[in-house]
Design a protein with these regions (language model features):
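Positively charged n-region of N-terminal signal peptides that target proteins for export
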Residues: 1-4
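Small-residue packing motifs within transmembrane alpha-helices
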Residues: 6-11
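C-terminal motif of bacterial Sec signal peptides marking the signal peptidase cleavage site
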Residues: 14-17
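Flexible, low-complexity junctional segments that flank or bridge functional domains
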Residues: 19-254, 269, 463-492
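C-terminal "post-core" interaction segments
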Residues: 231, 235-242, 247, 252-254, ...
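Active-site beta-strand/loop signature of hydrolases that rely on acidic residues for catalysis
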Residues: 260
Length: 492
């Protein structure tokens, strides 16, 4: 039986007729308890999951009767446990779920509940169980942007309670709308609480523009561009293109691309960014996708291939710098779509990485909700169909559905990309982002100009990240596929 697949702007459309596993339905367990969430999870993962062929419990012929299927669905009462223990493949590090699909999809668009402080967390103390935070940057137009708090400041407590591994989640990421940070100083590696406190309030619907800083520097006759980009959010692709238009107008010949705090996001935004750096020649292959075995049986090479872009999604001509070299600032918080830019550019451009090793996330995902009747697209989230999602099930899953490889077939960077020039951030000298004296940027400028000067890049107290605030947003470090793709699919 023929089925038709349409993937457009992150929405996969699959026309489904009845098949063996379509005939199995299991909305209730033997005792009448609802297992609709588990039912949705299994059916969605059976179609789309990258490791479907490797996970025995997701096999097309796993169940011979409804009773057997229902017994499986009720084997874990908690949907989270069901996903983790029954469906997730052992090699899968990044698939996740949410009990609130609206929060998840808002976050993909750059909308979150936040007070605007983006921070990293650090373990310290005799047993490495105490925690302190350091401010990375402040989101514009947030509550924090109106308060006396800035990059480089440290905090050790919340509402008078010292942070540790047991309480930091509740204190920093709990339901409390308002909290007070108890600040601290650092000198010679020693952290000392001070008398400063900052009250902060989380805002619902805070929108973060990821195009954070755009600068040009004229140093010894060389025009150097700098862009700090903090998330691949396709709603801001035009802003990104405008930033490159500014850099192009300024006549920059070298670019420092700061992705140190960028956890990823839209695959298409990564394609546009790479085109702005290198080329808008649509004959050049950017990346290719690999899906699960049963989907790959019907995909053509053209279906799986993405090329560099000459226009944004809105039809605006790409502002490209046509560079043959780019300097990328990285840390362990540089993940997914950030790494995709590095990998996609590598065959064409000399990518000089400065900082520390990236996260190592090379798979892409799709957002799935309990909408099995979407016209030709079972379970794939579609904004216009929110009223068709099962009102009794607000869960969403974000499973990995494929892996990207560059134009020469390389995709093996699960250990991350090591820097060409290692330089850790220094808690005692984080510097001002965008300032040419900020250590990572200064190092890049030194490499570009070839003038070493007398700058001392010794790191007194290196950042050894435990986790960061962005890892507690619904989208975390996710890479989301959003591309036009039209396929004929015949599922056995």
């Amino acid at each position: 039986m023929k089925k038709f697949l349409l993937l457009f702007m992150g929405i996969v459309s699959l026309s489904i007729s009845c098949s063996k596993d379509d005939d199995i339905v299991g909305p209730e367990g033997p005792g009448g308890e609802s297992v609709s969430v588990q039912d949705f999870m299994w059916k969605a993962m059976n179609i789309w999951y990258f490791w479907q062929q490797d996970q025995a419990d997701l096999a097309d012929d796993r169940f011979s009767t409804n009773e057997e299927y229902n017994a499986f669905l009720t084997s874990e009462a908690d949907p989270a446990d069901f996903f983790d223990n029954k469906l997730r493949y052992t090699e899968d590090r990044f698939s996740f779920y949410s009990d609130d699909y609206k929060s998840l999809t808002d976050n993909l668009s750059g909308i979150s509940r936040s007070n605007g402080v983006e921070f990293g967390l650090f373990l310290y103390g005799d047993n490495d169980t105490d925690i302190f935070g350091y401010v990375r940057y402040i989101v514009a137009n947030s509550d924090a942007s109106t308060k006396d708090i800035s990059r480089g400041e440290l905090f050790t407590g919340v509402d008078g309670q010292s942070l540790n591994e047991s309480n930091y989640r509740d204190l920093l990421f709990g339901e409390n709308a308002t909290y007070t940070l108890n600040m601290a100083d650092i000198a010679d590696g020693e952290i000392t609480p001070n008398d400063k406190s900052v009250e902060l309030t989380k805002q619902d619907g805070l929108v973060e523009n990821p195009v954070f800083i755009v600068n040009s520097y004229d140093i010894n006759g060389q025009k150097i561009g700098y862009l700090m980009y903090n998330g691949f959010t396709n709603e801001f692709d035009e802003d990104l293109n405008d930033a490159f238009g500014q850099l192009k107008s300024d006549g920059v010949t070298d670019l420092v691309l700061d992705l140190r705090y960028n956890p990823g996001g839209s695959v298409n935004s990564s394609r546009l960014l790479s085109s702005m750096v290198f080329s808008s020649n649509t004959n050049n292959v950017y990346i290719r996708q690999r899906w699960n075995d049963k989907l790959l049986e019907v995909f053509t090479d053209e279906d799986l291939t993405d090329y560099f872009a000459d226009k944004t999604g809105a039809g605006t001509a790409i502002n490209t710098l046509s560079l043959n070299r780019v300097y990328v600032l990285t840390t362990g918080s540089s993940a997914s779509a950030s790494e995709l830019v590095i990998n996609g550019l590598n065959p064409y451009v000399e990518v000089i990485k400065i900082g520390t090793t990236t996260r190592g996330k090379n798979e892409f995902s799709l957002t799935m909700v309990d909408d099995p009747n979407r016209d030709g697209a079972p379970f794939i989230y579609t904004p216009s169909r929110e009223n068709q999602i099962n009102p009794e099930n607000s869960w969403a899953i974000q499973p990995l559905v494929g892996r990207n490889e560059n134009s020469v077939g390389f995709s093996d960077y699960t250990a991350g990309f090591d820097p060409d020039i290692e330089l850790k951030e220094d808690l005692e000298n984080l510097g001002v982002l965008g300032d040419e004296n900020e250590p990572l940027l200064a190092k890049a400028i030194e490499e570009i100009t070839g003038i070493s000067g007398k700058r001392d890049f010794t790191v007194k107290t290196p950042v050894e990240l435990f986790t960061s605030s962005k890892m507690f947003t619904p989208m975390k470090d996710n890479m989301v596929l959003d591309k036009p793709l039209h396929l004929n699919l015949d599922l056995k």
